[in-house]
């Protein structure tokens, strides 16, 4: 099967920017922390038949290494320190850390080991799963088909937005993890760069480098989840995560993710010092209008001008949804819109995969994500979910999944 031989992932930079940002912080602060992460398919699809092909790709990823050209690119950015980049240059992903099996048709994947290494598996592995599955299901889809579909979407957007001043509309490509394929991803970004003046950048470091785009991203749920076990007092864990991030990046990468333990619990921890230092907030679950109103009200209650802050929306967006949010908020606060699947897997007759890889353990103990959307809650340990809800004064209503 020659189609299995060619590697899908050919660069360590073919990942989301925040993975490298978080990895540097982990390297500096939590070098000896161990974690485990697991794959989840939120739908009812049986993907186990692809386990062998995915495992072949994982083995190929063990050959990846940072090139001198890539090292020089990262070194020229303001985020990275030389000690981290020197270590990253020596890093080789270890496929033995990734356990893959076909469990009666279900795809099971568990990644375990040092956090500083495990952290790099999630995004490229999800991209591999998506590309392998779509390669079998929709072999007729080409990058040209994707570009033509995007042109139709952009035409619709121009029509819908004809009456709006879009100078404050900022689109970010968040499409790596559930893209149809790398070739489709590249075609989408090429089209956006030439046809859409409101593209601010991409979360993908490889394409940012190759296409002279701005790389964008800060931190993910796993940063907050791991602190649930790193921090000695569970109730202080979210504040500890926020402070540790500021210690690593005091003057940059200042967008905070709010929904690891619900927006309400986040805002209780996000006092005037954090709100003043952080540039803004990212929405990833729950009602985006209600969330944005809470964020603006919180800034105002703290005496901070919302027009000095940024809201980043990234939950299941497409261009019409982003435009609706822009209409609602753009006179009151700065806005960016991270669109992923609806850019890089928006194709005729193709159903995108609803797949994630999330942290489930840190230092051998459970961690949880209690998002603002019940279906996105992740934890296998009901007792820990109960303890987390008690620590953050949340009602004991949502069942862990």
From Swiss-Prot:
HAMAP family: NAPRTase. Catalyzes the synthesis of beta-nicotinate D-ribonucleotide from nicotinate and 5-phospho-D-ribose 1-phosphate at the expense of ATP. One of its GO terms (biological process) is NAD biosynthetic process via the salvage pathway. The modification Phosphohistidine is found at residue 221. It is an enzyme of class 6 (ligase). This is Nicotinate phosphoribosyltransferase. InterPro entries: N/Namide_PRibTrfase (IPR041525), NAPRTase_N (IPR040727), Nic_PRibTrfase (IPR006406), Nic_PRibTrfase-Fam (IPR007229), Nicotinate_pribotase-like_C (IPR036068). Transiently phosphorylated on a His residue during the reaction cycle. Phosphorylation strongly increases the affinity for substrates and increases the rate of nicotinate D-ribonucleotide production. Dephosphorylation regenerates the low-affinity form of the enzyme, leading to product release. It comes from Edwardsiella ictaluri (strain 93-146). It catalyses: nicotinate + 5-phospho-alpha-D-ribose 1-diphosphate + ATP + H2O = nicotinate beta-D-ribonucleotide + ADP + phosphate + diphosphate. It comes from the Bacteria.
């Amino acid at each position: 099967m020659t189609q299995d031989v060619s590697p899908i992932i050919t660069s360590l930079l073919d990942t989301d920017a925040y993975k490298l940002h978080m990895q540097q912080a982990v390297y500096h602060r939590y070098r000896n922390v161990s974690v485990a992460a697991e794959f989840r398919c939120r739908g009812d699809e049986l993907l186990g038949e692809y386990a062998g092909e995915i495992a072949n790709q994982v083995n190929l990823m063990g050959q990846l290494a940072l090139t001198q050209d890539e090292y020089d690119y990262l070194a020229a950015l303001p985020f990275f320190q030389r000690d981290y980049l020197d270590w990253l240059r020596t890093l080789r992903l270890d496929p033995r850390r990734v356990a893959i099996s076909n469990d009666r048709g279900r795809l099971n994947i568990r990644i375990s080991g040092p956090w500083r290494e495990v952290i790099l598996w999630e995004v490229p592995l999800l991209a591999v799963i998506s590309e392998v599955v779509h390669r079998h299901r929709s072999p007729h889809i080409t990058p040209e088909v994707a570009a033509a579909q995007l042109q139709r979407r952009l035409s619709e957007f121009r029509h819908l937005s004809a009456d709006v001043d879009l100078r404050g509309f900022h689109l970010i490509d968040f499409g790596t993890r559930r893209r149809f394929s790398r070739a489709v991803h590249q075609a989408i970004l090429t089209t956006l760069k030439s046809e859409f003046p409101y593209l601010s950048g991409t979360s993908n470091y490889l394409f940012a480098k190759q296409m002279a785009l701005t790389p964008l991203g800060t931190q993910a749920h796993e940063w907050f989840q791991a602190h649930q076990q790193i921090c000695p007092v569970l109730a202080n864990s979210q504040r500890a995560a926020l402070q540790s991030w500021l210690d690593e990046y005091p003057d940059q990468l200042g967008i905070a993710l709010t929904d690891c333990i619900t927006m309400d619990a986040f805002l209780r921890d996000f006092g005037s010092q954090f709100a003043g230092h952080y540039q803004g907030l990212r929405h990833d679950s729950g009602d985006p209008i209600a969330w944005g109103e809470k964020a603006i009200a919180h800034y105002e209650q703290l005496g901070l001008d919302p027009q000095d802050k940024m809201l980043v929306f990234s939950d299941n967006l497409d261009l019409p949804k982003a435009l609706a949010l822009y209409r609602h908020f753009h006179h009151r606060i700065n806005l960016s819109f991270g669109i992923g699947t609806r850019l890089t897997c928006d194709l005729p007759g193709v159903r995108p995969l609803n797949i994630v890889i999330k942290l489930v353990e840190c230092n051998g103990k459970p961690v949880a994500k209690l998002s603002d959307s019940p279906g996105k809650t992740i934890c296998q340990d009901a007792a820990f979910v109960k303890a987390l809800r008690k620590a953050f004064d949340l009602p004991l209503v949502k069942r862990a999944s």
